[in-house]
Swiss-Prot record:
Fe cation 2 binds at E51, E94, E127, H130. It comes from Salmonella typhimurium (strain LT2 / SGSC1412 / ATCC 700720). Its EC number is 1.16.3.1. The lineage of its organism: Bacteria, Pseudomonadati, Pseudomonadota, Gammaproteobacteria, Enterobacterales. Disulfide bonds: none annotated. This is Bacterioferritin.
Length: 158
């Protein structure tokens, strides 16, 4: 089915956002793991996998609309050097992605591409959940102090 060119362009932009997020969150997860912060590792790793699933949805939709998925035009990763910087970098990425999603959703609705719109609304709900988690973690750092926060991110195994 031949899709609207602007929808395909939006989907490719959103795909690019997801590809950056996959790599950024995966690297952050492994850095957290290396530092012994297993709870942060677990969440970031899960988020990386979720972003991969979102990317897969975009790829399938672009192909269905007879477009070509662009997996080469990647933005810059925002890799932090400490926990707070990493969480802030992830939050910036999520906020930008949510902004792009809202714009694409509005356009899809205006051209009556309800399937693309509904897919993007579902993904936006996931992104808003991640934004909420990141904001909560940054609030905890501010309230508890970094040392107490870091201590709370260590999972003792049997």
């Amino acid at each position: 089915m031949k899709g609207d060119v602007k929808i395909i362009n939006y989907l490719n932009k959103l795909l690019g956002n997801e590809l950056v997020a996959i790599n950024q969150y995966f690297l952050h997860a492994r850095m957290f793991k290396n530092w012994g912060l297993t709870r942060l590792n677990d969440v970031e790793y899960h988020e990386s996998i979720d972003e991969m699933k979102h990317a897969d949805k975009y790829i399938e939709r672009i192909l269905f609309l007879e477009g070509i998925p662009n997996l080469q035009d990647l933005g810059k990763l925002g890799i932090g050097e400490d926990v707070e910087e990493m969480l802030r970098s992830d939050l910036r990425l999520e906020l930008e992605g949510a902004k792009d999603l809202r714009e694409a959703i509005a356009y899809a609705d205006s051209v009556h591409d309800y399937v693309s719109r509904d897919m993007m609304i579902e993904i936006l709900a996931d992104e808003e959940g991640h934004i909420d988690w990141l904001e909560t973690e940054l609030d905890l750092i501010a309230k508890l102090g970094m040392q107490n926060y870091l201590q709370s991110q260590i999972k003792v195994t049997d």
